[in-house]
Regions:
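Structural beta-sheet core signal
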Residues: 2, 26, 102-104
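Short, well-formed alpha-helical segments that are part of the catalytic scaffolds
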Residues: 2-23
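Catalytic-site signature of metal-activated, phosphate-bearing donor transferases
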Residues: 57-66, 72, 78, 83-184
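Receiver (REC) domain switch/active-site residues of two-component response regulators
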Residues: 22-23, 45, 73
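A conserved acidic beta->alpha catalytic loop
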Residues: 17, 27-38, 52-54, 79-80
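A short acidic, amphipathic alpha-helical/loop segment
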Residues: 13-17, 38, 63, 90-91
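Conserved donor nucleotide-binding strand/loop of the catalytic core
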Residues: 37-67
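Acidic helix N-cap motif at the loop->helix transition within catalytic regions
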Residues: 9-12, 33-41, 87
Length: 184
């Protein structure tokens, strides 16, 4: 599942990365390009359009998570500028158990021109369907809400690469960061 807005140039690469999933749920938050039309043509993709006002990333992510049926066991949140290395699904199935609540895996936030990682760390956007919500208006965090102990596993054989769109403005981030501080 994921959120998008004006991502038509990333759709093919993104889809080739996520198509191992059983179903793909996307919340479009107001694209003015061909994103929605292109997504509707893809197998297994269900796209919903919704305006988020006032804009917050956590609200958008929670609305996209709510598109995933309650009976799904595992949710994988992926942005359109992120690409899983092939075989992620098999690795996930090989490591996930019925007691797992979340998985942590490799995230290459910055890569050089030869796809060698410059900045890498663990990320944990794979989780069970229930007992999770996104918090914070920007640089949102997946928060466990269950009453039982969270059981996070680490899967070093899953890697997600980040290829950010350098042309997109991040000017709205500062007010969202300020709001996040006020809410803390």
């Amino acid at each position: 599942y994921g959120i998008c807005k004006n991502e038509e140039k990333f759709i093919d690469t993104w889809y080739n990365s996520v198509k191992e999933a059983d179903a793909i749920y996307v919340l479009d938050t107001g694209s003015t390009d061909n994103t929605v039309e292109l997504l509707k043509k893809l197998e297994k993709v269900e796209v919903t359009v919704a305006k988020i006002d006032p804009w917050r990333f956590d609200t958008a992510r929670n609305k996209s998570l709510n598109l995933v049926p309650e009976d799904f066991d595992i949710c994988v949140c992926q942005d359109f500028d992120e690409v899983f290395k092939e075989g992620w699904r098999k690795e996930l199935e090989d490591h996930w158990s019925t007691s797992t609540t979340r998985a942590r895996y490799n995230y290459n936030w910055s890569l050089d021109n030869n796809d060698k990682p410059i900045v890498s760390f663990y990320i944990d956007k794979i989780h069970q369907r229930k007992n999770y919500k996104w918090t914070h208006p920007v640089h949102e965090v997946l928060t466990y809400t269950g009453s039982d102990k969270e059981n996070m596993i680490t899967i070093d054989t899953i890697t997600l690469n980040h290829y950010p769109d350098q042309t997109k403005s991040r000017s709205n981030y500062l007010p969202l960061l300020e709001l996040s501080i006020k809410e803390s």
